[in-house]
Amino acid sequence: MRGGGKKNGSNVEPLRATRPCAECGRPSVREHYPFCSERCRNVDLNRWLSGSYAIPVADDESKADDGDER
């Protein structure tokens, strides 16, 4: 057991600390972590599926040419 002491039923440790919702900033809940609700979770999913989230890529032609030669 953690802490080396006795553990009673009234001293339950949460699985993780509450963090702000990744979408709106309200406290997250366990069922929808890291979001506060199903709505915020679905808004984020929609952004991923619609392509709103993208990793920017800088085109460097000199590196692209070097990659072709082996």
Curated annotation (Swiss-Prot):
GO MF entries: DNA topoisomerase type II (double strand cut, ATP-hydrolyzing) inhibitor activity; zinc ion binding
Residues involved in Zn(2+) binding: C21, C24, C36, C40
An example Gene Ontology biological process: regulation of DNA-templated transcription
HAMAP family: DNA_gyrase_inhibitor_YacG
Quaternary structure note: Interacts with GyrB.
Protein family membership: Belongs to the DNA gyrase inhibitor YacG family.
Protein name per its UniProtKB record: DNA gyrase inhibitor YacG
Organism of origin: Rhizobium meliloti (strain 1021) (Ensifer meliloti)
